[in-house]
């Protein structure tokens, strides 16, 4: 029984899919063919050339050469080998000359009944368990059958009779489940996280509080250009690296910050609850984000300076929640002075980035909206601010 490798991934006559264009000549040099492809003595190079020139159907088909890329293995039983089964002397003679090869295929068939097979899919090897019955009703393509048939009559009888001479030994044409392809999170990536918002909303104090745990009242002037710091957030034992950028909020620096949107992984958009203008400008900021940032960028809306007194507050908490729902982004109120929800905002970003950081996209196990809602702390002081 001869084992013949057939690439099933390529199309007929497609130079990029494993076979040459129609009309290309096969090599005449017999040494260019693998010795173990055809075993029968009657299958000579002249015989192969004769079969290649014999038309199939309307005569327009020109069988492609065996592709160099092997993606499937088909075990064939030739007509002559079927006759060996009925001719003990011939079978004995073949076995005498090639005992090791015959034993190899017997052992190979046993492996196909119980083995754990692998399916090669875009350079990713994924383990797949299959039963010995294979795939009921499956037939190889007519092109593959024609390529290795020993004559038109043999081919037609073989194909129409359920291709009894052909069977799959260890092939899985079904891709493995997506989680089998999923690669571990890459903890070496620096995830660019940008703080955005009008000048004076407290972005620098917010970052310093997260980075050092300190609040320095009145010690910062308006940020000029870009400043950054690096932090590592550990999420369920996995290190998520954040490269946090503090941007200038002034209009004259807006063209500078636009350039940083394009490769940003996450954006924290802040407004000042004591300054309604900064809240009103959020929609303009979101418009810029939609225009310049990546489509799947993580966005968190933040109402900062929530430690304010009731008389100072100009934006209700409910207004921030409504704006977040309107743009489908999570919302929370924070205080760089007291530390309220400052760490939570970066933790939410890190968890969302980890969830998305697998090779095949979101693992489907984390919802940033639920996480923020379940973990946002209610302000213990000045509660009347929320009920204005």
From Swiss-Prot:
Ranges of compositional bias, category Basic and acidic residues: 47-56
Name of the molecule in the record: Ras-related protein Rab-26
Modification Cysteine methyl ester occurs at: 385
Covalent lipid adducts (S-palmitoyl cysteine), residues: 382
Biased composition (Low complexity): 67-86
Span of the annotated motif Effector region: 219-228
Cell compartment(s), UniProt: Cell membrane
PROSITE patterns linked to this entry: RAB (PS51419)
Positions that bind GTP: 197-204, 246-250, 304-307
Assigned protein family: Belongs to the small GTPase superfamily. Rab family.
GO process annotations (BP): protein transport; Rab protein signal transduction; regulation of exocytosis; symbiont entry into host cell; vesicle-mediated transport
Molecular function GO labels: GTP binding; GTPase activity
NCBIfam families: small_GTP (TIGR00231)
Keyword Nucleotide-binding: yes
Gly residues: compositionally biased ranges: 7-21
InterPro entries: P-loop_NTPase (IPR027417), Small_GTP-bd (IPR005225), Small_GTPase (IPR001806)
PANTHER family: PTHR47978
Encoding gene per record: Rab26
Function: Participates in exocrine secretion.
């Amino acid at each position: 029984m001869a084992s013949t490798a057939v690439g099933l991934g390529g199309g007929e006559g497609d130079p990029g899919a494993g076979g040459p264009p129609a009309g290309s000549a096969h090599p005449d040099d017999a040494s260019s063919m693998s010795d173990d492809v055809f075993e029968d003595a009657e299958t000579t190079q002249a015989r192969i050339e004769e079969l290649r020139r014999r038309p199939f159907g309307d005569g327009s088909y020109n069988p492609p050469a065996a592709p160099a890329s092997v993606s499937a293995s088909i075990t064939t039983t030739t007509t002559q080998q079927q006759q060996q089964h009925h001719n003990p002397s011939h079978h004995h003679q073949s076995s005498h000359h090639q005992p090791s090869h015959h034993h190899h295929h017997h052992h190979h068939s046993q492996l196909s009944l119980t083995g754990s097979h692998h399916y090669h899919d875009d350079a990713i090897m994924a383990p797949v368990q299959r039963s010995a019955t294979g795939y009921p009703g499956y037939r190889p393509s007519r092109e593959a059958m024609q390529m290795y048939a020993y004559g038109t009559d043999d081919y037609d009888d073989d194909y129409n009779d359920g291709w009894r001479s052909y069977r799959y030994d260890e092939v899985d044409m079904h891709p493995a489940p997506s989680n089998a392809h999923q690669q571990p999170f890459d903890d070496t990536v620096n995830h660019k996280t940008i703080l955005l918002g009008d000048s004076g909303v407290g972005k620098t104090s917010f970052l310093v509080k997260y980075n050092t745990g300190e609040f320095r009242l009145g010690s910062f002037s308006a940020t000029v250009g870009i400043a950054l710091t690096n932090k590592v957030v550990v999420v369920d034992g996995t290190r998520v690296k954040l490269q946090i950028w503090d941007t200038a909020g002034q209009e004259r620096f807006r063209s500078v910050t636009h350039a940083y949107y394009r490769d940003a992984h996450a954006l924290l958009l802040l407004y000042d609850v004591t300054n309604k203008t900064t809240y009103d400008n959020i929609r303009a900021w979101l418009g810029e984000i939609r225009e310049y940032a990546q489509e799947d960028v993580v966005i968190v809306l933040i109402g900062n300076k929530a430690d304010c007194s009731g008389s100072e507050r100009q934006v209700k908490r409910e207004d921030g929640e409504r704006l977040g729902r309107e743009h489908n982004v999570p919302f929370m109120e924070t205080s760089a002075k007291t530390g309220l929800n400052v760490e939570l905002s970066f933790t939410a970003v890190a968890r969302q980035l980890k969830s998305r950081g697998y090779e095949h996209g979101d693992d489907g196990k984390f919802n940033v909206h639920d996480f923020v809602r379940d973990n946002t702390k209610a302000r213990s002081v000045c509660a009347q601010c929320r009920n204005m």
